[in-house]
């Protein structure tokens, strides 16, 4: 498939310069392609959107490296390859309505918002929730609804969802989340096995049963309970 990578004359009202320039972003996109990311919608969206706005200014020069970056509060901004891969998996279900558990910086939320009809996203850490809300508002992501809450409870008022995406690793999936999947819907999550290894996993709802498929090894921060103001 051909992915249109923007040239350096393309403009973005929040584009960067130097290590945050379009040329630097395009280099990241080529690396993602080389590492197996194929969905052109994902690649073009990630080429366009300003990842450097989702980290502290001191780390902005590293925003287009294929690496995770710290957000504070024991959380990280996921490696771009992981964001791309998880977004690809979300899109295979052709969803209209997506629930994200773990807003974090809001970057994954933004990529989803550009590609699906509506996104609901929950964050348990108040400071991260507030920063993500400000960034997403600035970028015009008006199809996103945010909540400061324990993500393990989901967002039942807006259920059911075509896809639920967890951005932290669970050892046991909260039954409340599974109950909020539409029939035929999918949950994409890093799950821990009995040996402590993490696997990116697809869980598909078929009536009252849930089919699990392990995809690949990953490394995420743990899914925690409770709310931090």
Curated annotation (Swiss-Prot):
It holds the Pfam family PCMT. It is found in: Cytoplasm. It is an enzyme of class 2 (transferase). Its main location: cytoplasm. The active site is at residue 78. InterPro entries: PCMT, SAM-dependent_MTases_sf. Keywords: Cytoplasm, Methyltransferase, S-adenosyl-L-methionine, Transferase. GO terms for biological process: methylation; protein modification process; protein repair. It catalyses: [protein]-L-isoaspartate + S-adenosyl-L-methionine = [protein]-L-isoaspartate alpha-methyl ester + S-adenosyl-L-homocysteine. Catalyzes the methyl esterification of L-isoaspartyl residues in peptides and proteins that result from spontaneous decomposition of normal L-aspartyl and L-asparaginyl residues. It plays a role in the repair and/or degradation of damaged proteins. Belongs to the methyltransferase superfamily. L-isoaspartyl/D-aspartyl protein methyltransferase family. This is Protein-L-isoaspartate O-methyltransferase. It comes from Chromohalobacter salexigens (strain ATCC BAA-138 / DSM 3043 / CIP 106854 / NCIMB 13768 / 1H11). The gene is pcm.
